[in-house]
A protein has these predicted regions:
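Basic Arg/Gly/Lys-rich low-complexity intrinsically disordered segments
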Residues: 1-17
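Non-catalytic, regulatory and substrate/membrane-recognition segments associated with hydrolase enzymes
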Residues: 158
Length: 159
């Protein structure tokens, strides 16, 4: 039987530029349990909201959280954040995110889920479509191609 022992963050070589905001969604009511699991792994909590906790960690935190956290549905990497009051702002804000740093040239991706909170942008399918178009546009510009082939590994994206 494998037992994990938390040795804390002492001796870990991480710089702020290698830190990511990670989101751990969970079922409502399990936030305090999830918070304890994240703290036990030695990571800094950013926010606690209904059904999710945001925390900071390096690349190993992604793997460690996926292995040792039991109450989170999954571990998500926060790619960016911006305010969008219309679909043009959504497109431009999405396009401004450096997707090429996270998605390879041949990435196959789709927007799996789009949720809004008190927003005029309430059509999930329209949000998914706009986000997909903005990412493809960014990748086409970055790699200087006319057609963006999506024949590589799969990357689901949530908004």
């Amino acid at each position: 039987m494998f037992k994990y022992r938390n040795k804390g963050r002492k001796g870990r070589n991480t710089s702020m530029e290698n830190m990511y905001e990670l989101i751990a969604p969970c079922h409502f009511g399990l936030e305090s349990v999830l918070k304890r699991e994240i703290l036990d792994l030695g990571y800094e909590i950013v926010t606690v909201e209904d059904g999710r906790i945001t925390f900071r960690g390096d690349v190993t935190a992604i793997a460690r959280a996926n292995i040792f956290i039991r109450t989170a549905e999954r571990i998500l990497l926060k790619m960016g954040s911006f305010r969008a009051t219309d679909f043009d702002e959504l497109f431009e804000g999405t396009k401004a995110i450096p997707w090429e740093e996270f998605l390879p040239r041949d990435a196959k991706f789709w927007v799996t889920k789009a949720t809004t909170n008190k927003s005029a942008l309430f059509s999930a399918s329209a949000i998914q479509s706009i986000v997909k178009k903005a990412i493809v546009d960014r990748m086409k510009q970055t790699y200087r191609v006319e057609r963006f082939e999506e024949d590589g590994d799969e990357y689901p994206i949530r908004v």
